[in-house]
């Protein structure tokens, strides 16, 4: 299971992008993340913006109501709004849909004039050239492990039925990327050569990725990113990734059941190619962070043990598990609602760590217990030993993540409260990669 370290991983880049726009327009801005700074200022603001995912929409409504009672106008955006603007319109007076770069200047102008509209939306013609690097000047990063996170793009060219991106695509959203010059400039501005790209899909445009990595090659980075399984079809790009310092790739394998994958539109994933995919990364010294979703329609109680067996047999370095969750606005939600299988409408439980649907081939209790069991089994000391990476250079980062983030994460969390989470992150980076 994840500890609250996950929520303290890095600042929210969406809010920091808005902060950049606000600063560019000549205004003062303060960014607060409730995960790392629960004391929210209550006065001294002319406008409040809230970014929310589905699971915190209700919290956003409560918080927004508190500010409105103080006479402060409130606008709400984020993936929870962009993926289902109709639902959000019922909850909030003013919503923002799509990339902030396409409408936040209008929000600021209208707020200054006292005439906020009900809805602001970035048009479908929005160009990735308009995407901005975020500003970190307005946020206290000491409550986060890292501030070396960069998003080179927004969205994903795929639209898997259970993913936020499938809902966003229904409302005109699409994959766009920044310019190579913009991303490279942001990389160079960081005080570290360790970079985490947090794009939904770092190879959404393989041509862009190749051009970007070629530009970054001289910097000699250590970096990680998330990619889709079709990276296996791009051996030249994998070679370039390894040559430019790629340490780990997050990949949504999602299931060891082919029927489960086909049932949610995950056509780019082929179970028969999973072993080759893992080997393609390992042979280049790149670690695999495998994501799995449990509770899909072909899953049954045996799925959990088979997943653990596959992970151990293929020496997968890290595993992230999720419970199948029907985000409102997605095709998966529509089908679960149509089939009468949604058993919990409390949006705060839509965080992939609660069972909110009735699975086909097991009970909700079996699904939850199996989800927890995968975490426990993958991160036993014995299985951590069995999954040791072949590449010696990856041994220290592997052990740090498996032991001090997953297995003993609670102890690392306590250390963060004692010395500061930013210092914990800096110590981990130096121990793993011998760089600042």
Predicted regions, residues:
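Acidic, low-complexity intrinsically disordered segments
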Residues: 1-190, 361
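A structural motif corresponding to the C-terminal end of an alpha-helix
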Residues: 19-29, 190, 277-288, 314, ...
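Alpha-helical structural signal in soluble globular domains
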Residues: 21-25, 66, 70, 87, ...
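Radical SAM enzyme core and accessory elements
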Residues: 26, 31, 46, 91, ...
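Flexible glycine/acidic-rich beta-alpha junction loops that bind and position SAM and/or redox cofactors
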Residues: 83-87, 207, 259-264, 294-302, ...
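Structural recognition of alpha->loop->beta junctions
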Residues: 87-106, 240-250, 306-321
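Radical SAM [4Fe-4S] cluster-binding motif and immediate context
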Residues: 132-289, 296, 302-305, 309
């Amino acid at each position: 299971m994840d500890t609250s370290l996950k929520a303290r991983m890095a600042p929210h880049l969406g809010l920091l992008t808005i902060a950049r726009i606000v600063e560019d327009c000549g205004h003062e801005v303060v960014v607060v993340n409730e995960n790392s700074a629960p004391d929210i200022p209550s006065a001294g603001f002319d406008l409040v913006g809230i970014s929310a995912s589905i699971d915190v929409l209700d919290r956003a409504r409560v918080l927004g109501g508190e500010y409105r009672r103080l006479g402060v106008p409130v606008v709400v955006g984020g993936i929870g709004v962009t993926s289902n603007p109709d639902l959000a319109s019922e909850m909030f007076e003013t919503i923002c849909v799509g990339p902030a770069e396409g409408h936040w200047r209008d929000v600021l102008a209208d707020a200054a004039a006292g005439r906020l509209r009900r809805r602001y939306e970035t048009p479908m013609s929005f160009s990735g050239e308009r995407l901005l690097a975020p500003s970190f000047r307005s946020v206290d990063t000491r409550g986060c492990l890292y501030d070396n996170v960069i998003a080179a793009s927004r969205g994903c060219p795929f639209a898997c039925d259970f993913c936020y991106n499938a809902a966003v695509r229904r409302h005109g959203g699409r994959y766009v990327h920044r310019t190579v010059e913009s991303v490279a400039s942001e990389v160079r501005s960081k005080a570290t050569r360790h970079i985490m790209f947090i794009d939904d899909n770092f190879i959404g445009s393989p041509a862009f990725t190749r051009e970007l990595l070629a530009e970054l090659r001289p910097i000699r980075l250590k970096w990680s990113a998330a990619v889709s399984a079709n990276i296996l079809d791009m051996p030249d790009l994998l070679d370039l990734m390894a040559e430019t310092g790629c340490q780990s790739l997050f990949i949504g394998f999602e299931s060891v059941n082919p029927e489960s994958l086909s049932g949610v539109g995950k056509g780019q994933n082929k179970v028969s190619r999973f072993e080759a995919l893992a080997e393609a990364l390992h042979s280049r010294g790149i670690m695999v962070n495998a994501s799995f979703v449990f509770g899909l329609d072909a899953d049954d109680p045996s799925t959990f043990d088979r997943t653990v067996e596959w992970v151990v047999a293929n020496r997968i370095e890290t595993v992230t598990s999720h419970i199948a969750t029907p985000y409102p606005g997605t095709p998966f939600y529509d089908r679960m609602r149509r089939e009468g299988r949604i058993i919990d409408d409390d949006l705060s439980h839509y965080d992939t760590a609660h069972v909110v649907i009735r699975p086909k081939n097991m009970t909700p209790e079996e699904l939850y217990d199996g989800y927890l069991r995968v975490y426990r089994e993958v991160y036993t000391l014995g299985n951590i030993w069995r999954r040791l990476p072949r590449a010696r250079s990856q041994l220290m980062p592997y052990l740090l993540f498996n032991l001090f983030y997953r297995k003993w994460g609670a102890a690392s969390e306590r250390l963060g409260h004692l010395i500061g989470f930013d210092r914990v992150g800096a110590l981990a980076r130096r121990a793993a990669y011998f760089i600042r």
